From Swiss-Prot:
Compartments it resides in: Plastid, Chloroplast
Keyword Ribonucleoprotein set for record: yes
Organism: Pinus koraiensis
Annotated Gene Ontology cellular component terms: chloroplast; mitochondrial small ribosomal subunit
Quaternary state and interactors: Part of the 30S ribosomal subunit.
Keywords linked to the UniProt accession: Chloroplast, Plastid, Ribonucleoprotein, Ribosomal protein, RNA-binding, rRNA-binding
Ranges annotated as spanning the membrane: none
Single annotated GO MF: structural constituent of ribosome
HAMAP family, per the entry: Ribosomal_bS18 (MF_00270)
GN (gene name): rps18
Protein name, entry field: Small ribosomal subunit protein bS18c
GO BP annotations, alphabetical order: translation
Amino acid sequence: MKQTMDKPKRSFRRHLKPIRRHLKPIRRHLSPIRSGDRIDYKNMSLISRFISEQGKILSGRVNRLTSKQQRLMTNAIKRARILSLLPFLYNEN
């Protein structure tokens, strides 16, 4: 016959600090692209808002764009660069 010694189960939760959850109010961020704006390589006033001072494409998190909008914006910026509407790099002078 097998003998097992049952140990009393300890509660380790008493050593842990209680978790405090700070609920932040949910803010709805407005999209920087309005409903009338078309993401197009010819729309330079729109494209220039999503490029850094060095000429880099800003990330979607910085831009507050959806992934689909960011993808369309990236393609429009690249197309504008190829057609020489935008420089690939900005001079630092």
